[in-house]
């Protein structure tokens, strides 16, 4: 329940609505626990990709366990819509985004999460948005992929499929 306690504390500290995209299993667990969310916390069905990205662009901060948060944060920074991005995880598949300071890994405990949100919001307010990850803003990705795949067809056929 420390995550929900942290959400309530964020609502109180920043005195603004918090949209909690709540998976049905999480909603059920929350109801069974009897935990009461702050009145500023709005429980919502999971959002589609477009709606979620529109919300991110206009958010005070984004706190999420989504594995795509690093890419989204980097992309929106590159197009002039940076937002404080805080990931509720203990590791990431995208260390390159962490290296460019596009997002924070907050951990999963209340104290670390609240500290990460405070730091991310303050840095964002001071104009410190991190740097977009160069690999995420490549313009000709499909061309590169086609050329790479085509370049390895002969090797894969020979080494994997034993076609000579």
Language model features with spans:
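Nucleotide-activated sugar donor-binding and catalytic core shared by glycosyltransferases
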Residues: 1-16, 21, 26-164
């Amino acid at each position: 329940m420390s995550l929900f306690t942290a959400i309530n504390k964020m609502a109180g500290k920043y005195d603004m609505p918090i949209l909690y995209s709540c998976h049905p299993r999480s909603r059920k667990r929350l109801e069974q626990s009897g935990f009461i969310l702050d009145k500023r916390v709005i429980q919502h069905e999971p959002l589609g990709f477009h709606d979620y990205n529109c919300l991110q662009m206009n958010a005070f901060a984004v706190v999420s366990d989504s594995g795509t948060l690093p890419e989204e944060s980097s992309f929106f920074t590159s197009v002039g819509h940076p937002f404080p991005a805080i990931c509720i995880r203990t590791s990431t598949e995208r260390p390159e985004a962490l290296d460019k300071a596009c997002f924070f890994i907050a951990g999963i405990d209340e104290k670390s999460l609240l500290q990460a949100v405070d730091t991310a919001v303050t840095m964002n307010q001071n104009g410190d948005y991190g740097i977009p990850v160069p690999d995420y803003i490549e313009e000709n990705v499909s061309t590169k992929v086609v050329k790479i795949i085509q370049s390895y067809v002969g090797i894969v056929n020979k080494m994997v499929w034993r076609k000579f």
